[in-house]
């Protein structure tokens, strides 16, 4: 398949990420005592070696929200897709980037 410029189209499942690799994911939610712990437990289901040393926390300026950056060891696109689905489906999570 080619596009209008006669260059090959990128296959839809082709990834720009080389696996395995460290991959940052930003997760935001309401400021709650167990938010970070809950996210750590969820991420560990997909990356068993994940620990709090691979996470940064930033409260919002108003103190109502907490932003987390988790660095996961990505082993496949399927793993990342499943992790994103689990994070976005969690009731404590407002945004995943």
UniProtKB/Swiss-Prot annotation:
What the entry lists under SUPFAM superfamilies is as follows:
YbeD/HP0495-like
| Lineage top rank: taxon | Bacteria
- PANTHER family reported in the protein's UniProt record: UPF0250 PROTEIN YBED
Q: Its family? A: Belongs to the UPF0250 family.
In Swiss-Prot or TrEMBL terms, this protein is called UPF0250 protein RSc0326
Q: Which organism is it from?
A: Ralstonia nicotianae (strain ATCC BAA-1114 / GMI1000) (Ralstonia solanacearum)
Organism lineage string: Bacteria, Pseudomonadati, Pseudomonadota, Betaproteobacteria, Burkholderiales
